[in-house]
Amino acid sequence: MIDNQKYVILSLELHLFFSRIMKEHALFLEAGFTNKNYNLAMEADHYKKQFEDLLSYTVSASNGIIRPDILYSEELVTTLTSVAEQKTEEFTGIEINKNITTRELNLQSGVNPQVGQDLVNYVAQLNSDAIRLLDGLINFKERVLDGVLSCTIFTSNYPLLLEHIIHEANLYRSYVVDLENKIDIESKNAKEIELFWDHIMMEHALFMRGLLDPSEGELINTSNDFAIKFNELIEKTNEMTDSNIKNITEETLNETVEFKDFKEAGASGIEQCKIKSIILPLLADHVLREANHYIRILESYKNM
């Protein structure tokens, strides 16, 4: 059981990371529909706005509360996020609340913050809102995936990407439910966490490989190499025991840092129009933040 202080801190940190991820999932869905599916695009836009609101309310309560390592990991926003949002808005015509990013860049961390009952109640409402919104968004994503697999909907998003964003939403929801039950989400089974994020990293590499222009041979090959490497790490992690867990975690951390560097160079290259692809700048920044998130988790295991 976690106390009120940890409940508040973990909840706010969770929403700062994942509600931004969810609003961007909705934007990627919206951008991927054709004119025929205007109603689906508008439904995606609805969820984008709802998760923007959730993120905004979370930012309002987070200053001086969240931990330094979360703030400095660049899993919430990166140095590229603001420009990525601006360019993605220009490319798609989809409105993005960029003020939230500015506010997040100005957040300050806290150490042993005072948490009163009013803040506990505020966070409980955020968690309740998050579960309600996630139930709707997961259902929407599943309907889109079903339509794509039955060939009744066309989208520029891969079916695997749709499955990928459903898995992330389900993970987010499970964490919110755990927090409402006062379960410490940081004490989750390390093997399960590593397997989840290894799959996510592998799929990122596959998406990047498939969204780069065919002329970008070197980048395509590097993306493919990362996909192979994370697939190997999945196999190793599946067989992980107490005797080799530290070695495998260390190997995974090193590989994820390398992949993060590749993603960062790619995001910068896409923003500067130096890489030929059909990757939205915000998608490049999105996958970079997820790598940063995983790196922080792996580093926390090293220190245990």
Swiss-Prot record:
Upon deletion of the gene, what happens? Inactivation of the gene produces changes in the ultrastructure of the spore. In thin-exosporium spores, the absence of the gene leads to a thinner coat layer. Inactivation of the gene has no significant effect on the presence of a polar appendage. Disruption of the gene does not affect the integrity of the spore.
Task: Identify the keywords attached in UniProt to this record, alphabetized.
Answer: Sporulation
Biological process, per Gene Ontology = sporulation resulting in formation of a cellular spore
Q: What gene does this protein come from?
A: cotB
Protein name listed in UniProt:
Spore coat protein CotB
Against Pfam families, the record matches this protein to: DUF2935 (PF11155)
Q: Briefly, what is this protein's role?
A: Contributes to the formation of thick-exosporium spores.
Q: Where in the cell is it found?
A: Spore coat; Spore, Perispore
User: Which InterPro entries has this protein been placed in?
Assistant: CotB-like
